[in-house]
């Protein structure tokens, strides 16, 4: 099973964890990204995340399908937030359940690393004294 979502609404860790649990799985890996208070010495006020939704959903599905097949995992959850986020907010949750922990770890790392490289999500960091677009991806 795969659950993919891009939303302007706050992401819910508890709901994500409840969904990812599978009675047949001994390993669950959960990655939660948070907005940092500082980047390269600049105090972050907020982030603005934007995307081309359908293209991003398609790419996330491709990533999830690959991970599911390569590591034989049971469940994959990829939730990404868009819009304005404050320091401490959660822009991304990735969770993987598998029969064994190594498969869950490996699949989760692959998903977040590939998401950051290939999914069309744009991030603007707003600082106290300026702003900058950070790459083409989060």
Question: Would you name each region that the model predicts?
Answer:
Residues 95-97:
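Short hydrophobic/aromatic beta-strand micro-patches
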Residues 1-90, 99-138:
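N-terminal, polar/charged subdomain of small-to-medium soluble alpha/beta proteins
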